[in-house]
Amino acid sequence: MTTEPTPASATAASSAAAIEQAAHAIVEAAIEQFYELRPDLRQRHGPRGIAVCREDCLYHIEFLAAAIRNGSVDAFVQYIRWVDGVLRAHAGGSHGLGQMLELLGQGIRRSAGEAAWTAAQPTLDAALAALQGRVEGHGLYAMPPTSALARSYLRAILQGNRLLAQQLILDAVREGMPLRQVYLEVFQPALYEVGQLWETGQISVAQEHLATAITQTILAALYAQTPLAPGRGQRAIVACLSGNHHEIGARMAADFLQWAGFDTLYLGANTPEASFLAMVDDFKPHVVGLPSSLPRHIEGVRAVIEQIHANFRRDRPTILVGGLAFNLVDGLWRQVNADVWGHNAGEAVDRLVGAAA
């Protein structure tokens, strides 16, 4: 789901920048206050849990700044509802997210200034209202499968029945369903629903991983049986950067690029930034794809794009981004200085090819 942003003003942009610059000071103060107020959580979390909480708070600040810059209050509210759902399902008991948001707001006022606090307050208030149950919402993965095939496929992968799942897809392809439709109307909504089920604690991490692994196996089988399109004489590289293990979307993007005639290298999940940039230097691609599933991946993508702009000025590749993290905030792809974005891999590649025509 995307939200329509209010055009960013100079004040919003400067406030977002001030919050980003003060992020570490804001978070450190909030963490210290939070665990003083909640000794029960300090004991439960321990040093490792506190470190995770600190990292999560930096993500909250990063996403808040992006929402302010883009005028997308609803996107931040949706993100916080998702965080709340994950914490409730997996952390158990009282997790203190609302209390932490209050403390982060106080930190913004102290460390980033009154103007930044004025810009942030409506967004934080909306998120707090949502946590208190006054606003209806849904999870990050709100794209339930609607077709009978997608629902049958979802049941098969949740049961761990690879043979049935594969047979459902192969039968559909034999009966004439285009691969694009299989990818976008079966795989994507089914896996989004898997994410939603994990988010709400209805399935385990192991079940989520199994569903993903089955889909990866079927994707590979389909790709091996698909005739390649005539080459365009252009190259592409697609990768998930460090910390991003959600690679199905990236695999789909790589396949769509290959079908569009690009000689495509797919580097997979958790690719170190330095290795990716070295590959760009060696392979000299015309296009790079950097999908991002979660908001916390955005900063790494932004940093790599900055390096590409700085180091490959003469033959800079076209930069394509997408994924759930970018879908939450309209215009976020422009904020990271990408060239092309789409709601899904098919749309992104269509826009890429259309722009080059």
Task: Show where each model-derived region lies.
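Conserved binding/catalytic microenvironments
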Residues: 216-221, 228-256, 260-283, 290
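Cofactor-cradling patches in redox/metallo enzymes
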Residues: 256-258, 266, 271-331
